[in-house]
Amino acid sequence: MLEAVTNPKSSLATFSKQLNGLLQAKVVVCKSVNPYFNLALENYLYENSTAKHCLLLYTNSPSVIIGRNQNPWVEANVKLCRDNFVNIIRRKSGGGTVFHDFGNLNYSVLMNREEFSHTENASIMIQALRNLGVHARLNQRHDIVLAQSQRKISGSAYKISRNRCYHHGTMLLNSDLEGVREYLRSPSTGILSKGVSSTRSPVSNTKLLKAEFIKQVISCFLLHKSHSTTTKPLSKPRASSKRLYDIEPKSVITLEQNDLLGVPSILKAVNELQSWEWTFGQTPSFKQHLESTELSVSMDISVVHGRLEKVIFSTPNATLEHELSSIPWTGLCYESGFANTFLISGIHSKEAISILKWISDSI
């Protein structure tokens, strides 16, 4: 494990040495469950790791992770996530939306660009599953599914740059599958988005213990990438075994979030991932049409960078339509309850107030 720096002057050389060890690591197991830190760590290794191949393993607290080019209001129930303190995070890679929780293990394989292969990286996970008695295979969408039921247990995505790439994914061990369904079911209607849409698939848990699966994944990875000549394939773990890894200790680095708090680029990445401008402001442009027969009104919204660009109302009442159109909508963040800003002003007609309440309930 890396040691946190308590005395910068006396520990700088030690910390630098430890950091270099991290960047040369073959396997990194992060004990943090902070999704912002874990994704920032992944990006840090992606940009700085000098290892030919590096495996990163981590678990996140309950979070909805959307792809780089996706619309959170289409992919998730944003209000429910916020009500239940479930993080919504836009990652750097493409692909679809996934739900993370404590029953889920996330993996990321970092490598040189020319060595990228969906099949090769998935085969490592499949072998680890088979070693534990779970029969799985790779389908045509490059998802790992249970061989018998064909239910998805692992989805993946990737990011490729000029020289490096990473292939990362999830593994459903004992996740809250009802949470997956609830948080990834958007209540929004009438949205026409330029963003990438997720493909929904039936999912299932492997019901494996996390420690046992981690152990198998590391062993299979090291063998497959020829990092270790002394590591042997692991048999099914004994229930009495208390050791996490039966491999060379120098092959694996474990770390906590506090170990890297002094790395500026990681802190910067965490702040970016937490920002509204990144999570929602990076949403591809979209339009939404809403209408209420009860109130005899329709509303067309254009949203750019997560903010209202144009709002057009249509209602038989010309005076009401003018009143609604006169409200300064442009530039407001597209958020649940954005119309409440004007409800509290107390200067609108009764009809306009009813419509503003309808808008708040509809977004």
Curated annotation (Swiss-Prot):
Signal peptide extent: none
Biological pathway: Protein modification; protein lipoylation via exogenous pathway; protein N(6)-(lipoyl)lysine from lipoate: step 1/2; Protein modification; protein lipoylation via exogenous pathway; protein N(6)-(lipoyl)lysine from lipoate: step 2/2
GO terms assigned for molecular function: ATP binding; lipoate-protein ligase activity; lipoyltransferase activity
Protein's organism: Schizosaccharomyces pombe (strain 972 / ATCC 24843) (Fission yeast)
Enzyme class name: ligase
Principal place of residence: cytoplasm
Protein name: Putative lipoate-protein ligase A
Function summary: Catalyzes both the ATP-dependent activation of exogenously supplied lipoate to lipoyl-AMP and the transfer of the activated lipoyl onto the lipoyl domains of lipoate-dependent enzymes.
One Pfam family per UniProt: LplA-B_cat
GO biological process assignments: protein maturation; protein modification process
Lineage: superkingdom: Eukaryota
A single cellular component GO annotation: cytoplasm
PANTHER family referenced in this protein's UniProt entry, alphabetically: LIPOATE-PROTEIN LIGASE (PTHR12561), LIPOYLTRANSFERASE 1, MITOCHONDRIAL (PTHR12561:SF3)
Binding site for ATP: 91, 96-99, 152
Record-listed E.C. numbers: 6.3.1.20
